[in-house]
Every structure is written in structure tokens, then in C-alpha cells.
């Protein structure tokens, strides 16, 4: 879901019957205190939905043009394993990024924490918003 973070609780509650039993990606950031994600509301209102947290740690520029010098950037996400995971990973790949699962939905705070260094570099260090991260392995 991509609605303003401040509208998430109301949107989830109003549409809970339609959302339940679906695969949902929580993409919105609720700025201004409290958790960035809306996972608690999703879990309370849509107990049969498969909830993921992704697409929340980069600026939109990285989704519109995911082209980088050293190949695709990694998009950190979390959520349940299973068939819905492959759908989420296919979507991330289709956008042009490499899916990097950090675990089940209990890792949402870890996914959310990626936003902090992104903001520090994009704004604080004035590197611009079109930047992303990549996990390097031997």
C-alpha cells in the first residue's frame, strides 16, 4: 500500500474486509514519532493477510530509475516465507532492484532502520536522493 503514512490506520480499518487474505506490502512511512510502519494495525485488522514491509527505505527516484554504476541495488524487505514471498520478490526484481529478505515480519524495525542512513546520505551529506545500498559478498 502506498498512501500517506498518516492515513494508513484509517485506510486499513475502512478496507479491512477487502485486504484480509491478500498479500500486502506496507510501503508507507508514518513520520513524526512511533513506529514508521503500520504492521500492528494490519495484524489486528487483517489477521489472514500476508504482510510484508518493503519499498519504504529509498526515495521514489530509485524506483523510477533503478540504474546504478555497479548493477542493481538491494531492496531490504521482510515478511513471511512461502508462495507470497516469491510474488513480492518478483515485484522487487521487476522494479529493477535485488530483493534482500531480512527475515519474517518481526524484522520490520530492521528494514525501517535502513531509512536513517539513506536520509543521512541523501540530505545530510547532500548526495542526492538517487542513491541506494548493496550487500557485497565474496
Model-derived segments and their meaning:
Residues 75-138:
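Active-site-lining helix/loop region of Rossmann-like oxidoreductase modules
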Residues 1-2, 45, 77-78:
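Active-site-adjacent beta-strand anchor residues
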Residues 1-23, 29:
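Rossmann-like NAD(P)-binding element
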Residues 24-26, 74-77:
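Short glycine-rich or small-residue beta-strand-to-loop segments that form or flank ligand, phosphate
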Residues 9, 48-53, 99-101:
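Short, structured loop/turn "capping" segments at alpha-beta junctions
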Residues 18-69, 84:
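Rossmann-fold NAD(P)-binding glycine/threonine-rich loop
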Residues 4-8, 57-59, 81-82:
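Short beta->alpha connector loops
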Amino acid at each position: 500500500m502506498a498512501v500517506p503514512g498518516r492515513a494508513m490506520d484509517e485506510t486499513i480499518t475502512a478496507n479491512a474486509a477487502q485486504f484480509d487474505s491478500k498479500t500486502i506490502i506496507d510501503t508507507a512511512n508514518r513520520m513524526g514519532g512511533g513506529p514508521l510502519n503500520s504492521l500492528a494495525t494490519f495484524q489486528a485488522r487483517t489477521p489472514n493477510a500476508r504482510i510484508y514491509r518493503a519499498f519504504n527505505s529509498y526515495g521514489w527516484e530509485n524506483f523510477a530509475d533503478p540504474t546504478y554504476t555497479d548493477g542493481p541495488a538491494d531492496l531490504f524487505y521482510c515478511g513471511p516465507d512461502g508462495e507470497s514471498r516469491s510474488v513480492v520478490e518478483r515485484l522487487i526484481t521487476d522494479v529493477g532492484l535485488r530483493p534482500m529478505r531480512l527475515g519474517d515480519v518481526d524484522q520490520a524495525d530492521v528494514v525501517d532502520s535502513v531509512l536513517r542512513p539513506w536520509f543521512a546520505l541523501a540530505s545530510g551529506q547532500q548526495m542526492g536522493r538517487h542513491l541506494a545500498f548493496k550487500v557485497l559478498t565474496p
